[in-house]
A protein has these predicted regions:
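Bacterial N-terminal signal peptides
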Residues: 8-16
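N-terminal "mature-domain start" segment
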Residues: 24-80
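Short, surface-exposed coil-to-beta transition loops
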Residues: 73-78, 88-90, 147-154
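Sec/Tat signal peptide C-region and signal peptidase I cleavage site
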Residues: 19-23
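Signature of long, low-cysteine stretches enriched in small and polar/charged residues
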Residues: 119-157
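A short acidic-to-branched-hydrophobic micro-motif
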Residues: 76-109
Length: 198
């Protein structure tokens, strides 16, 4: 039995060392985005290669600022006017593989992540932030990061093998300008059927 322990340890260690390491997300300012296996430029817009979803160049008054690739087929585009560091609202629009999860399971996972990351509690949908789409799951929360209070929400749908998700975040209490800008950005997002991919 004792001789089996070193062998088991060595086998486990070799499996651990041979396992692929999760890469860090790759964040690129929009002006520097080049075509890749995950996203391609489409004029001023960005096309998600796997799903064919088109990320617009702006959402309302919020221009696209950066593209993040989290892994194969897992892409987000960040939209903001002044940026979170300047106390402004921002919206992140995601397209990523749905895997084997239902949209209800995905929505539960999103809500748990928000609750854990922001120490957040469920809140009412802010006025003007209502959105409709087939199969839509959504939620809004009040939370904090350090000393700053935020109001943050998500909208998620499953389209075929893909999840489309909006994450909207505003300082809390939001100014009328931030609320209006964020509402316009959320309203501008297309959560309808995906285009036919080539």
């Amino acid at each position: 039995m004792r001789r089996a322990l070193p062998l088991a340890f060595a086998t486990g260690l070799s499996l651990l060392l041979s396992a692929p390491v999760q890469a860090e997300p790759v964040v690129t300012p929009v002006a520097e985005v080049v075509d890749s296996a995950d996203v391609r430029r489409d004029g001023e817009r960005f096309r998600h290669v796997g799903s064919g979803y088109v990320f617009p160049s702006s959402l309302g008054d919020m221009p696209a600022r950066k593209v993040t690739i989290f892994g194969p087929g897992d892409v987000s585009v960040n939209y903001t006017v002044k940026g979170a560091a300047a106390g402004d609202a921002w919206v992140d629009l995601y397209a990523y593989p749905a895997g084997d999860w239902t949209i209800a399971e995905t929505a539960d996972d999103i809500a748990s992540a928000i609750t854990n990351s922001f120490g957040a509690t469920p809140a009412l949908v802010p006025a003007g932030m209502e959105k409709r789409a087939d199969g839509l799951h959504q939620g809004w929360f009040d939370g904090r990061i350090g000393e700053r209070s935020f109001k943050t929400g998500y909208y998620a749908v499953r389209r075929g093998d893909w999840v489309l998700k909006i994450r909207a975040t505003m300082p809390s209490p939001p100014t009328p300008e931030a609320l209006a800008r964020t509402a316009a950005a959320v309203a501008a997002v297309n959560l309808g059927p995906l285009p036919a991919t080539r």
